[in-house]
């Protein structure tokens, strides 16, 4: 470009010289030709200048480019050296499709066959994964190449499509088909308002639901809301149930969460049987609750200030708060305490001798610690062979120094009275042979082959009523006797109602009318009463915590446990066959989050059922003998311990789940919800040991919050009732009620068929 511009300039100058013979005119008069040549020269110079500017830019760009290449290490392009490779040994098709081919010194080599095939890599055959049975039972498996495929889940089941490749996958991954609950999804043909029972892969239709009448053929119609079960008009409050009594009369009972006389019901927040506000009726249960939010079914109020002891910070009104008062229920502002135990002189039954337990066996006002005749049988303790059981005759058949009245082996000498399983039968004579499973060993069972935990023997002939065809021994067989438990050979029946005059209104002749008798067919049991109870410590040798402290109120119908303790039971002495057991459960503190509950079917300290409720998930702090993890929620367990009370049973009770040779988990509330602080719950238990029927329900206020539904288990065929605690303080069990009941519930049969 520069050379070209210079060439143009030289040509122009030459032209100028040629035209003027080398001379420029001296005047200002330029000829036209000269002017034209100057203009052309000027234009040429302008072009040269532009070309020079462009050339400078290009040179600068080339310079910068070269410098940048030097900075990044780039070298001038070189022609690559040509190499000659030998011909590849891995020719197409040498290996099975999808198999890698590798050249080696010894020639080409094929890799393994793909998943779902077997062979040497060059030749691969399909694997039949169906031989591993990856599909759900009754589902067809289809082998593909490669892999397998399962057909859809069978009718009554649902699940995702299932397919895969390879034997390893087929063995490790089975088709999952989940039972369809047709009763929940509506995929059933049961008539509306009837019971639908889900079965594996199908369903069954049952009777009409409560509150409805009819059947599957005619349909289920709502029972008139204000009628009694016998069809007569109901006089009850809208929040009360009409109940038919044994004699055919009707009673009204307020529903859960309500209290009153049944004709009138009001809200009952704490579920203790007393309404929050006074009702317009005169019965005791119509009075206003003196502790609206704390259950106190006895309504105790020692200072008569209208505030119940259970919620009164100064129950005795002496100016000293309960938590510091050494006599919280007896007025003593001076707090005098001569013997220095936990109790002030005003309420201490042994003022000059320490006795924190305040036990008073004969209820004479003098504690056992300072009473020279503990049982009140007029025989002084040092010479009394049963110092805690009245026995003025001092009979001692086996001569072991322990009177028959308190001897756990009266026919066999055993002065130590050892009884490791707490069943009142000493180890010296305890055979543990109980073929009918009712908790009474065969040698002491009045019906050894028929479960009868209550051991009722109305005519005292040594043969239990359960296996005696003439219970009252009046010569009339039970099947024809209009008073089965009361002798009446004449069978008088003035009103011809089928019930003999001798037992009319009081079937067991215990002088408690059937309407209020909790066991109208057992003269030995009349009212709910836990005032006499057996204490069972389930970890007696452990050092984790202290033992429970039980306080009984309301004439034996309320129990309070005050301590953060080891696992323990308070067990009543009455044994039951079939029973209904209900009560109100309340933790009256915001401290701790552990177990509380109740027991039934108690036969000994190794054999019982327990319903227990944990508030929060927690691992037990004693890792020996094994790690135990408690989950929140309600649990129903069958305890059958091979070791009995101790660390093994302790950790097994804490653990949610089965523990071999200790505990089986029969049911757990699927909600996994713990109990709430200072909240009342009402439970209802039905136990029919003759068929293994168990069902437990929990209410929070009027709302049903948990239902085990029907559980069938015959581990314990009857036993005693009680309450349970484990590491939880300030538990209240209020408004306790039990009732003998051998009637089989209607929902038993459907469950039996389901489990058959």
Swiss-Prot record:
Residues 333-345, 351-369, 415-425 have a biased composition (Basic and acidic residues). Residues 466-475 have a biased composition (Acidic residues). Binds 11-14 calcium ions per subunit. Glycans are attached at residues 120, 741. Keywords: Apoptosis, Calcium, Cell adhesion, Disulfide bond, EGF-like domain, Extracellular matrix, Glycoprotein, Heparin-binding, Repeat, Secreted, Signal. Proteolytically cleaved by metalloproteases ADAMTS4 and ADAMTS1 with ADAMTS4 showing more potent activity. Disulfide bonds join 90-101, 95-110, 113-124, 130-141, 135-150, 183-196, 190-205, 228-242, 236-252, 254-265. TSP type-3 repeats lie at residues 267-299, 300-335, 336-358, 359-394, 395-417, 418-455, 456-491, 492-527. GO terms for cellular component: collagen-containing extracellular matrix; extracellular region; extracellular space; protein-containing complex. Its main location: secreted. Residues 322-502 are annotated as: Disordered. Its cofactor is Ca(2+). Plays a role in the structural integrity of cartilage via its interaction with other extracellular matrix proteins such as the collagens and fibronectin. Can mediate the interaction of chondrocytes with the cartilage extracellular matrix through interaction with cell surface integrin receptors. Could play a role in the pathogenesis of osteoarthritis. Potent suppressor of apoptosis in both primary chondrocytes and transformed cells. Suppresses apoptosis by blocking the activation of caspase-3 and by inducing the IAP family of survival proteins (BIRC3, BIRC2, BIRC5 and XIAP). PANTHER family: CARTILAGE OLIGOMERIC MATRIX PROTEIN, THROMBOSPONDIN. This is Cartilage oligomeric matrix protein.
């Amino acid at each position: 470009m520069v050379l070209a511009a210079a060439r143009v300039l030289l040509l122009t100058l030459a032209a100028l010289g040629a035209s003027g013979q080398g001379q420029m005119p001296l005047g200002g008069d330029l000829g036209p030709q000269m002017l034209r040549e100057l203009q052309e020269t000027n234009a040429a110079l302008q072009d040269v200048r532009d070309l020079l500017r462009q050339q400078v830019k290009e040179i600068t760009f080339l310079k910068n480019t070269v410098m940048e290449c030097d900075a990044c290490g780039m070298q001038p392009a070189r022609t690559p050296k040509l190499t000659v490779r030998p011909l590849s040994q891995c020719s197409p098709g040498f290996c099975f499709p999808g198999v890698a081919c590798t050249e080696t010194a010894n020639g080409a080599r094929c890799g393994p066959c793909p998943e779902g095939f077997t062979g040497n890599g060059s030749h691969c055959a399909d694997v039949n994964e169906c031989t591993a049975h990856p599909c759900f039972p009754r589902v067809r498996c289809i082998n593909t190449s490669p892999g397998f495929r399962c057909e859809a889940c069978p009718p009554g089941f649902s699940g995702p499509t299932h397919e895969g490749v390879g034997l390893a996958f087929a063995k490790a991954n089975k088709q999952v088909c989940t039972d369809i609950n047709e009763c929940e999804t509506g995929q059933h043909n049961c008539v509306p308002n009837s019971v639908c029972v889900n079965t594996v892969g199908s369903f069954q239709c049952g009777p009409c639901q409560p509150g409805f009448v009819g059947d599957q053929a005619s349909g289920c119609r709502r029972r008139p809301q204000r009628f009694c079960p016998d069809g007569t008009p109901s006089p009850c409050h809208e929040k009360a149930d009409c109940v038919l009594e044994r004699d055919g009369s009707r009673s009204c009972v307020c529903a859960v969460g309500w209290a009153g006389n049944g004709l009138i019901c009001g809200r009952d927040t704490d579920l203790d049987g007393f309404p929050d506000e006074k009702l317009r009726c005169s019965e005791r249960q119509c009075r206003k609750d003196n502790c609206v939010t704390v259950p106190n079914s006895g309504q105790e109020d020692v200072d008569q200030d209208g505030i119940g002891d259970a919620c009164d910070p100064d129950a005795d009104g002496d100016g000293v708060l309960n938590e510091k008062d050494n006599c919280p229920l007896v007025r003593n502002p001076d707090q005098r305490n001569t013997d220095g135990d936990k109790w002030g002189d005003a309420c201490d039954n042994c003022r000059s001798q320490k006795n924190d337990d305040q036990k008073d066996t004969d209820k004479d006002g003098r504690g056992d610690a300072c009473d020279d005749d503990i049982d009140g049988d007029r025989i002084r303790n040092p010479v009394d062979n049963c110092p805690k059981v009245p026995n003025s005759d001092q009979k001692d058949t086996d001569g072991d120094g322990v009177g028959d009245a308190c001897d756990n082996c009266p026919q066999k000498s055993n002065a130590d009275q050892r009884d490791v399983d707490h069943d009142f039968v000493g180890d010296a004579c305890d055979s543990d042979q109980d073929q009918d499973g009712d908790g009474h060993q065969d040698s002491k069972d009045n019906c050894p082959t028929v479960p009868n935990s209550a051991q009722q023997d109305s005519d005292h002939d040594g043969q239990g009523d359960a296996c005696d065809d003439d219970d009252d021994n009046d010569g009339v067989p039970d099947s024809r006797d209009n008073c089965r438990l009361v002798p009446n050979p004449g069978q008088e029946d003035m009103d011809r109602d089928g019930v003999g005059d001798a037992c009319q209104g009081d079937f067991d002749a215990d002088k408690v009318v059937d309407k209020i008798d909790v066991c109208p067919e057992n003269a030995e049991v009349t009212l709910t009463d836990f005032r006499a109870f057996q204490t069972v410590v389930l970890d007696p040798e452990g050092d984790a915590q202290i033992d429970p402290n039980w306080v009984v109120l309301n004439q034996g119908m309320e129990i309070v446990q005050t301590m953060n303790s080891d696992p323990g039971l308070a067990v009543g002495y009455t044994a039951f066959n079939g029973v209904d057991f209900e009560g109100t459960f309340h933790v009256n503190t915001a401290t701790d989050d552990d177990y509380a509950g109740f027991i039934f079917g108690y036969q000994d300290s190794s054999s019982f059922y327990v319903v227990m409720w944990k508030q929060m998930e927690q691992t037990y702090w004693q890792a020996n003998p094994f790690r135990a993890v408690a989950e929140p929620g309600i649990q129903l367990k069958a305890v059958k311990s091979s070791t009995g009370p101790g660390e093994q049973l302790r950790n097994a009770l804490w653990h949610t789940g089965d523990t071999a040779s200790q505990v089986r988990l029969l049911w757990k509330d699927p909600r996994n919800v713990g109990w709430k602080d200072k909240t009342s719950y009402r439970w209802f238990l039905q136990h029919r040991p003759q068929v293994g029927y168990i069902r437990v329900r929990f209410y929070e206020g009027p709302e049903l919050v948990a239902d085990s539904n029907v559980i069938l288990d015959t581990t314990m065929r009857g036993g005693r009732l009680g309450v349970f605690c484990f590491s939880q303080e300030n538990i209240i069990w209020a408004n306790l009620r039990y009732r003998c009941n051998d009637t089989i519930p209607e929902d038993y049969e459907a469950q039996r068929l389901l489990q058959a």
